[in-house]
Amino acid sequence: MSNVRSDKPFTLAGRTFQSRLLVGTGKYRDMEETRLAIEASGAEIVTVAVRRTNLGQNPGEPNLLDVLPPDRYTILPNTAGCYDAVEAVRTCRLARELLDGHNLVKLEVLADQKTLFPNVIETLKAAEVLVKDGFDVMVYTSDDPIIARQLAEAGCIAVMPLAGLIGTGLGICNPYNLQIILEESKVPVLVDAGVGTASDATIAMEMGCEAVLMNSAIAHAQQPVLMAEAMKHAIVAGRMAYLAGRMPKKLYASASSPLDGLIK
């Protein structure tokens, strides 16, 4: 059957990962809760805000890498808190120094503090510089299919359109734009931001996303560790449903059992 989907490995920057759930490290009560939640999530890629997290640049303070060791997790430094391309590029270069030449980064350049919406003009500028500088750039962007295409053409290895605004938990607000991005993209598409609960993650995966990145949905849950485990299963279920192919929607009913041979 030509329309049967077969699974393929989730690969970024030449590395293959088993988990399609990426998680952030902010907003937890303490480092122990961070550790427990990330363990429960099964995530292999953990994103860290370089400007807000001690990765060794502040000796004598708690170091996140002590509870999330780089030999167990792939650390994905991000540029959260940057509002222009210059800041973002500087932050990525700092991360590379702190992580011994690590080139995989998550680029985000924000427009304002109220919406945390991406500034796509500055994002594109930063992406072009970082790619030339040898970085493997995963990029947070709007759900504009044209911008997503331009970022991929600039050399980003993955585009990460928002489902909803960061920290809102609103779920996928514009599935139609996301579907266009998924159909057109030649690089992996990961939903980033806006996920609120397990069903949101499942829907993103059912649509065909390669993976989902989240932080607030787990950290702000009443029981973060339990929600982390729920998200692990949600991602797997969504991927399996995508591969299986859902039944077509119909307006009218269709009996599950055959009508011939009924007992009279």
From Swiss-Prot:
Example GO molecular function: thiazole synthase activity
Keyword Metal-binding: no
GO biological process: thiamine diphosphate biosynthetic process
EC number: 2.8.1.10
Protein name as annotated: Thiazole synthase
A single GO cellular-component term on record: cytoplasm
Positions annotated as active site in the UniProt record: 106
Main function: Catalyzes the rearrangement of 1-deoxy-D-xylulose 5-phosphate (DXP) to produce the thiazole phosphate moiety of thiamine. Sulfur is provided by the thiocarboxylate moiety of the carrier protein ThiS. In vitro, sulfur can be provided by H(2)S.
CDD domains documented for this protein: ThiG
Pathway participation: Cofactor biosynthesis; thiamine diphosphate biosynthesis
Entry similarity comment: Belongs to the ThiG family.
Binding site for 1-deoxy-D-xylulose 5-phosphate: 167, 193-194, 215-216
Subunit structure: Homotetramer. Forms heterodimers with either ThiH or ThiS.
Localization of this protein: Cytoplasm
UniProt keywords, alphabetically: Cytoplasm, Schiff base, Thiamine biosynthesis, Transferase
Top-level taxon in the UniProt lineage: Bacteria
InterPro entries linked: Aldolase_TIM (IPR013785), Thiazole_synthase_ThiG (IPR033983), ThiG (IPR008867)
Keyword Cytoplasm recorded: yes
Catalytic activity entry: [ThiS sulfur-carrier protein]-C-terminal-Gly-aminoethanethioate + 2-iminoacetate + 1-deoxy-D-xylulose 5-phosphate = [ThiS sulfur-carrier protein]-C-terminal Gly-Gly + 2-[(2R,5Z)-2-carboxy-4-methylthiazol-5(2H)-ylidene]ethyl phosphate + 2 H2O + H(+)
Any Pfam family the entry gives: ThiG
